[in-house]
Amino acid sequence: MDKILSGKTVAIDIKGQIKNYTEELKASGKSLKISSILVGDDGGSVYYQNFQEKLANNLGIDFEKIKLDESISEENLKLKIEELNKDDSVNGIMLLLPLPKHIDERAVTNLIDADKDLDCLSEVSVGRFYKGEKCFMPCTPNSVITLLKAYNIEIEGKEVVIIGRSNIVGKPLFQMFLNENATVTVCHSRTKNLKEVCKRADILVVAIGRANFIDSSYVREGAVVIDVGTSEVNGKITGDVNFDDVYEKASLITPVPGGVGSLTTTLLLKNVCKELD
């Protein structure tokens, strides 16, 4: 039995949906446009922005790549965001983080129009999300839920354990599992008896950024294991879960790479295709 939950496979289907949608739009004389802002020249962010651009172009979405000098003032960055907010041709805005230390990240992200905030960064967007109002879904948590549903894995009534309580993954994922009527426990660095808690999980999600931290001793026989973490070890990308050790015990498991991360950018672009929600 193949135990692999492949984000790549699921992404192929979603990309097809996006491509069909944008072709229909263009046939009617319309188009979609995303503006992506990069401040500075962080290597990881440069790579990610280039990847976003390539994927968007392949799927028929116009992509504006905005590169700003690391020394830009906070005020000028705010002016740029306000300009994009007012531009009716821009359907979505992405601001690559982190920002330079002299810029107040919270103040800047809160300026992004919630109706264009593809990454769900602003406090208005986050508020809408937690209140269950219409908003763009946080992409990494949404990737986890999308992957589970694509493989017809039952969530309702299941015991879910999330290791990690970050604002980007753990907390919004907690809410999304609640919305699916799961019973959810969130673990963190102060959790006592972590192994015992993890062994209760029907679905175990790990998002702590510690390479190979979770081995089979944390996993209940037959559990579904979702690895959100990515770390570089000896030049290779690896996850938070010791894949080889856990594979035999899990009923299904995501690889790293090729799992959750393979879906995130695709779902980010799908966010701008509102009729596909």
UniProtKB/Swiss-Prot annotation:
InterPro entries: Aminoacid_DH-like_N_sf, NAD(P)-bd_dom_sf, THF_DH/CycHdrlase, THF_DH/CycHdrlase_cat_dom, THF_DH/CycHdrlase_NAD-bd_dom
Metabolic or biological pathway: One-carbon metabolism; tetrahydrofolate interconversion
Organism, scientific name: Clostridium perfringens (strain ATCC 13124 / DSM 756 / JCM 1290 / NCIMB 6125 / NCTC 8237 / Type A)
Designated name of the protein: Bifunctional protein FolD
EC number: 1.5.1.5, 3.5.4.9
SUPFAM superfamilies tied to this protein: Aminoacid dehydrogenase-like, N-terminal domain (SSF53223), NAD(P)-binding Rossmann-fold domains (SSF51735)
Subunit record text: Homodimer.
GO molecular function: methenyltetrahydrofolate cyclohydrolase activity; methylenetetrahydrofolate dehydrogenase (NADP+) activity
One example of a Gene Ontology biological process annotation: methionine biosynthetic process
Reactions catalysed: (6R)-5,10-methylene-5,6,7,8-tetrahydrofolate + NADP(+) = (6R)-5,10-methenyltetrahydrofolate + NADPH; (6R)-5,10-methenyltetrahydrofolate + H2O = (6R)-10-formyltetrahydrofolate + H(+)
Function: Catalyzes the oxidation of 5,10-methylenetetrahydrofolate to 5,10-methenyltetrahydrofolate and then the hydrolysis of 5,10-methenyltetrahydrofolate to 10-formyltetrahydrofolate.
Keywords: Amino-acid biosynthesis, Histidine biosynthesis, Hydrolase, Methionine biosynthesis, Multifunctional enzyme, NADP, One-carbon metabolism, Oxidoreductase, Purine biosynthesis
Binding site residues for NADP(+): G164, R165, S166, S189, T230
